[in-house]
Amino acid sequence: MNMTQARVLVAAVVGLVAVLLYASIHKIEEGHLAVYYRGGALLTSPSGPGYHIMLPFITTFRSVQTTLQTDEVKNVPCGTSGGVMIYIDRIEVVNMLAPYAVFDIVRNYTADYDKTLIFNKIHHELNQFCSAHTLQEVYIELFDQIDENLKQALQKDLNLMAPGLTIQAVRVTKPKIPEAIRRNFELMEAEKTKLLIAAQKQKVVEKEAETERKKAVIEAEKIAQVAKIRFQQKVMEKETEKRISEIEDAAFLAREKAKADAEYYAAHKYATSNKHKLTPEYLELKKYQAIASNSKIYFGSNIPNMFVDSSCALKYSDIRTGRESSLPSKEALEPSGENVIQNKESTG
């Protein structure tokens, strides 16, 4: 063997070793686990992140993600209970595989477990949902419930079939429906929108009317309360005036009563005093005192009898009667007026 052949052999050996090393060394990313197959059999020891060595061409590996990942299911057909075929453009399933469940799930469902456990299950559950509802319900009324219903159905089956695989969320895009039906739905939605706007306007008007009514009620109650307070104030003022008047009347009545009582008492005392004072002897004394103090002299037949004693009065009347009988009358002594006139005429 010459030098050239030796060099070629060494180069071949080095190349073979390099190829073997390249084939045996592999890298696992963070958030992944490596499962190994040797001769088609799954090995029981997954490897974590980092560089690892395996037997080239005999042992193979698959990287399995153990962090959150999103699987997309596209263009899923769905037939409603009315016979209308619709298509859902995309369904996103956010899931996470626990590291402790990697070996069992890969052994039972292969490293492409998501196709078996998620994709096929999505098709089945979605068709079950659509076949039980009408297009109106799927497209409008119950569309907001599809996400939650799919999530619950998937998680319920996974808890039995693949413990450790958790569904975090399901997002479903709006279904694609035939163009004619879509236009009808758009028109219907437009009419619904107009109806909702009209209903909201009516509610606003009713609310404003209710607000105005409440304002009017509050204003009326305020006016009524003010009037009531003023009325009560006037009533209190009148009651106060009445009370003052009653007090003044009572005081005046008490004063007048006391005055009348005093006058009555004084008159009663005066009468009692006069009763004891005005005896016949005292009255006789006062009469003579009055006569003695009187300077007037009365002549004629009309002298008051009250100033003459009764015995003297009788004697005076008898004397006067006798005198009048002895004297001629005045008419006889004096000539009458006619005789005097006749004598004057005869004389002339």
Swiss-Prot record:
InterPro entries named among the record's database cross-references: Band_7, Band_7/SPFH_dom_sf, Erlin1/2
First-listed, main subcellular location of the protein, grouped into a coarse class: endoplasmic reticulum
Residues covered by region (Disordered): 325-348
Localisation per UniProt entry: Endoplasmic reticulum membrane
Chain positions carrying an annotated carbohydrate: N108
Cytoplasmic side: 1-7
Membrane topology: Single-pass type II membrane protein
Mod. after translation: Deubiquitinated by USP25; leading to stabilization.
One record GO biological process: cholesterol metabolic process
Tissue: Expressed in heart, placenta, liver, kidney, pancreas, prostate, testis, ovary and small intestine.
Biased composition (Polar residues): 339-348
Keyword set includes Isomerase: no
Listed GO CC annotations: endoplasmic reticulum; endoplasmic reticulum membrane; membrane raft; protein-containing complex
SUPFAM superfamilies listed in its UniProt record: Band 7/SPFH domain (SSF117892)
Record's keyword terms, sorted: Acetylation, Cholesterol metabolism, Disease variant, Endoplasmic reticulum, Glycoprotein, Hereditary spastic paraplegia, Lipid metabolism, Lipid-binding, Membrane, Neurodegeneration, Signal-anchor, Steroid metabolism, Sterol metabolism, Transmembrane, Transmembrane helix
All ranges on the Lumenal side of the membrane: 29-348
Transmembrane portions of the chain: 8-28
Modified residues (N6-acetyllysine): K269
Molecular functions (GO terms): cholesterol binding; ubiquitin protein ligase binding
Disulfide bonds: none
Assembly behavior: Forms a heteromeric complex with ERLIN2. In complex with ERLIN2, interacts with RNF170. Interacts with AMFR and SYVN1.
Disease cited in the entry: Spastic paraplegia 62, autosomal recessive: A form of spastic paraplegia, a neurodegenerative disorder characterized by a slow, gradual, progressive weakness and spasticity of the lower limbs. Rate of progression and the severity of symptoms are quite variable. Initial symptoms may include difficulty with balance, weakness and stiffness in the legs, muscle spasms, and dragging the toes when walking. In some forms of the disorder, bladder symptoms (such as incontinence) may appear, or the weakness and stiffness may spread to other parts of the body.
Stated family: Belongs to the band 7/mec-2 family.
The protein's role, per its UniProt record: Component of the ERLIN1/ERLIN2 complex which mediates the endoplasmic reticulum-associated degradation (ERAD) of inositol 1,4,5-trisphosphate receptors (IP3Rs). Involved in regulation of cellular cholesterol homeostasis by regulation the SREBP signaling pathway. Binds cholesterol and may promote ER retention of the SCAP-SREBF complex. (Microbial infection) Required early in hepatitis C virus (HCV) infection to initiate RNA replication, and later in the infection to support infectious virus production.
Listed name of the protein: Erlin-1
Source organism (scientific name): Homo sapiens (Human)
Gene that encodes it: ERLIN1
